[in-house]
From Swiss-Prot:
Coiled coil: 76-223, 259-389
Cytoplasm found in the keyword field: yes
Species in which this protein is naturally found: Arabidopsis thaliana
Gene behind the chain: KIN14M
Segments of this protein annotated with the region Disordered: 1-31
GO cellular component, one term: cytoplasm
Protein name: Kinesin-like protein KIN-14M
GO biological process, one term: microtubule-based movement
Length: 745
């Protein structure tokens, strides 16, 4: 019990005290309980002596009084520790409840966003059904079913929101209860501090009387300490002997079981031998009787012969059983000897286990050091390769295109220095030779392409800024390279493959103490306007006039980081969640049909992944950024035949790509002024092209002979990019708290 009320209304503490048998409490028979009256009585107690000159009695009474005081003080100290522990426990419970509430709020927000997406999709389906209803009356039933699904989804959303709200209210009630308990504990803690102060004050008055008794107490303490240490050592030895005895008993039990089995087998064999001997004696008696009567009864000769044969067979069986008995006795002797051998083997195995544990610890340390060295060497290799690298990819011929013409237009050198890196383009009888970091032929698979960039993606986990973008004319395979073909796992693009590698690597690095948080944003630049592709507000993504009503401003800070104001940022925990977001963004992206491409991307697509990692053992924090960009395709107005909105889109695309060319040209010439602000695209890519990022460009070209001019322009632009020196990328390591605004650089 915590306490009880006295007549004057004050609380009289009454707490059970643990057995203090290691010290003075052993004289009072175990558990002791104090009340406030007991404490006051003890403090005001006056020691009475039978004789004023009996110093032995005075010393014993004083020591007894001091022991009771020390027991009371010890009780208050343990009580204070219990309250401190309870207070810390309640504080931890409150923090866990607050964290649980925060997690519930985040989950509620994510669920609301997902369900809003579902509702928007259902509304879109319902709108299309309504249009069909006006045209064809026969589809009325399908429209009603779609409306029913939307209502069910809305009811499910409302029920889910109600359940989450109820759980949140319950958690808040638990938090309020915990706060009340903490307040009560604080009040009791103050009361105990007052008691402790009064006891310490009175104890200081008695300190003078205790000086004579201190010497005896110190000697007793030293003796007790020595005894306790001896007991501890003996307990350790006893524990080790118990473990050895238990192991020996296990081995002995196994041997005894084998011995009992062999003894039982020997007894059984002896019984069988005795039975056979009895049968033999009985048959011998019968034979003797028959032989005595043989002269009279010749008819029994056959029976006698049969019995003799049986007797010989039984004699053989007796010999075999005797041999088995001897073998069993030998096995028993071997089992007795194997008991000692097993005990010795157990000790050897125990030593081997300890040695293996030591080797395992050394191997783990070497693994950690090796991982550090791998990261260092990997980043050194990337630096030596250059900050802006260029890969060229030639798409395969489509159906209807002449493969023989492709062989005349594009060729690949076979010399050792240019193998896998060179490409030759033939135009009007003149050959143009280019060399890049890597050239992918049309037969190269998506996996082949990803293997070449996988180490660059690893740099983002190590704390670097990484940018990969695809450039080329419309229809050259940029979107296929970056996104792949939905529904076909073998043709997944670089973006989903990069995310799968990052999630797998994050899982493998957990054993080394690393924890990562990942955040995703997706946007498009359409007609020099930024659109948020993850926004749940449909009007914020696209307006009828092609201009987004939401203004998204690009901001650069002093540290070289870039973020887009008000852009939707989503915390991701799995590659499936990212696939869902990519599908959502693909539905919102601007795509149109032109004379050169059935599904032409009419905007620049920017996928950004911010990576924040923390190592619990080294307390090191890294922050990396991975930008994956699918640029809109360049096209000539004379070939695309664009008019109206398509004409405006083409002009905006060509203008932004021209601004990108101006930036690359200025960087290649190392001019003082680089025109990053000439377009939204170049301003957004400023961190990737400004020297603090590891940047890779894919130049995609088509083998179609009619596109040789555009392919030559793309290859020349790529060669200029490959010649740029933009500086050395830096690893971003710090101990600052996570910034939840997604940075593009």
């Amino acid at each position: 019990m915590v306490g009880e009320m006295t007549n004057n209304g004050r609380i009289r503490p009454s707490f059970p005290v643990k057995d203090l048998t290691s010290n003075e409490g052993s004289e009072y028979g175990g558990p002791v309980e104090f009340t406030r009256e007991d404490v006051e009585t003890l403090l005001h107690e006056r020691i009475k002596y039978k004789s004023k000159y009996n110093y032995k009695e005075r010393c014993e009474n004083t020591m007894d009084y001091v022991k009771r005081l020390r027991l009371c003080i010890r009780w208050f100290q343990e009580l204070e520790l219990d309250y401190a522990f309870e207070q810390e426990k309640l504080k931890n419970a409150m923090e866990m409840n607050e964290k649980h509430c925060a997690d519930l709020e985040v989950n509620l927000k994510v669920k609301e966003e997902e369900l809003n997406m579902v509702i928007d999709e259902l509304r879109k389906n319902f709108a299309s059904v309504q249009v069909q209803l006006a045209k064809e009356q026969t589809e009325k039933l399908a429209a009603n079913e779609s409306l029913g699904k939307e209502r069910e989804a809305r009811i499910a959303v409302e029920s889910l929101q109600a359940a989450i709200t109820e759980e949140l209210a319950k958690t808040q009630g638990e938090l309020q209860t915990a706060n009340q308990r903490i307040q009560a504990v604080n009040d009791m803690y103050k009361l105990l501090q007052e008691y402790n102060s009064s006891l310490q004050l009175y104890n200081s008055k008695l300190q003078g009387d205790l000086d004579e008794a201190h010497e005896n107490i110190k000697r007793g303490e030293k003796e007790r300490t020595g005894i306790v240490e001896s007991i501890g050592n003996l307990k350790g030895q006893f524990k080790a002997l118990q473990d050895q005895l238990a192991a020996s008993k296990v081995s002995q039990d196994d041997v005894m079981k084998q011995k009992d089995e062999l003894v039982n087998e020997i007894v059984s064999l002896k019984v069988e031998i005795q039975q056979v001997k009895d049968d033999r004696d009985r048959h011998i008696t019968e034979i003797e009787t028959l032989q005595a009567e043989a002269t009279k009864q010749n008819d029994f000769k056959d029976t006698i012969n049969e019995l003799e044969s049986k007797c010989s067979v039984q004699n053989k069986e007796i010999e075999e059983l005797q041999d088995q008995l001897v073998a069993s006795e030998r096995k028993l002797q071997v089992a007795d000897l194997s008991t000692f051998e097993k005990m010795n083997e157990f000790e050897e195995q125990k030593e081997s286990i300890m040695e293996l544990k030591g080797r395992l610890e050394e191997a783990e340390l070497k693994l950690i050091e090796g991982e550090k060295l791998r990261k260092k060497l990997h980043n050194t290799i990337q630096e030596l390769k250059g900050n802006i690298r260029v890969f060229c990819r030639v798409r395969p011929l489509l159906s209807g295109e002449n493969s023989s013409e492709e062989a005349k237009t594009i060729s690949y050198p076979t010399s050792l220095e240019a193998l896998g890196r060179g490409i030759d383009l033939l135009q009007n009888g003149q050959s143009h030779c280019f060399t890049f970091d890597k050239v992918f032929v049309p037969s190269a698979s998506q996996e082949d392409v990803f293997v070449e960039i996988s180490q660059l993606v690893q740099s983002a986990l190590d704390g670097y800024k990484v940018c990969i973008f695809a450039y080329g004319q419309t229809g050259s395979g940029k979107t296929y390279t970056m996104m792949g073909r939905p529904g076909n796992p073998d043709e997944k693009g670089l973006i989903p493959r990069c995310l799968e590698q990052i999630f797998q690597t994050r899982q493998s690095l957990r054993s080394q103490g690393w924890k990562y948080e990942l955040q995703v944003s997706m946007l498009e630049i359409y007609n020099e306007t930024i659109r948020d592709l993850l926004s749940t507000n449909k009007e914020a993504v696209r307006a009828d006039n092609g201009v987004s009503p939401q203004k998204y401003a690009i901001k650069h800070d002093a540290s070289g980081n870039t973020h887009v104001v008000e852009l939707t940022v989503v915390d991701v925990r799995s590659s499936k969640q990212v696939s869902f977001l990519l599908d959502h963004a693909a539905r919102n992206r601007s795509v149109g049909k032109t004379a050169m491409n059935e599904q032409s991307s009419r905007s620049h697509f920017v996928f950004t992944l911010k990576i924040s990692g923390f190592n619990e053992s080294t307390e090191q924090q890294v922050q990396g950024v991975l930008n994956l960009i699918d640029l809109a395709g360049s096209e000539r107005l004379s070939k695309s035949g664009s008019t109206g909105d398509r004409l405006k889109e083409t002009q905006a695309i060509n203008k932004s790509l021209s601004s990108l060319g101006d930036v690359i040209f200025a960087l290649a010439k190392k001019e003082d002024h680089v025109p990053f602000r000439n377009s939204k695209l170049t301003y957004l890519l400023q961190p990737c092209l400004g020297g603090d990022s590891k940047t890779l460009m894919f130049v995609n070209i088509t083998p179609e002979p009619s596109s040789t001019g555009e392919s030559l322009c793309s290859l020349r632009f790529a060669a200029r990019v490959n010649a740029c020196e933009i500086g050395t990328a830096h690893r971003h390591v710090n101990a600052r708290p996570l910034d939840y605004r997604l940075s593009l650089g």
